Amino acid sequence: PQGGRGYHVLAALISETRLCYGPWNGTEQDVALAEQWLPSGRTVAERFDGDRVPAVAELLRRYLTSHGPATLRDFAWWTKLSLGEIRRALPLIVDDLEADGAAEPAYWRPGLLDEVAALGRASSAPLLLPGFDEFVLGYQDRTFAMTEAEHQRIVPGNNGVFKKTVVQGAQ
């Protein structure tokens, strides 16, 4: 499809669980048939006996593991869940997480403190990120990494299309 409709078709098929993002092929992420790629078995509702709190806790744990360090507000923005629901779920996984020790908003991630200690300083080697990379897309507040002018260049018109990005020294 032309004119950006391909993204809409892909999003619709993913939201209907017909397709899903599959393995990385070395240059980009493949799209796969959901029934062939996703594990079969119990549904999320069955796994958590219909209790949303542990289901939200598991989703929060996975988000912070893959996207962290991030705030609870980042997760709320990403999932569109309420902060109240997220705060009720946090105690179920808090022992598996570490926070940056700052006042609100705290940034959470499993193994965060060890990771920061091991890294010491941020790498000065540039990172070449594809469009729609989670470094930019995964956070509601992106000012930790860019100015408003840079944001306009990466997300022109704030229209939901994210261009390729070069990151150096966390900026």
Can you name each region flagged by the protein language model?
Residues 1-136, 140-142, 148-171:
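Long, low-complexity intrinsically disordered regions
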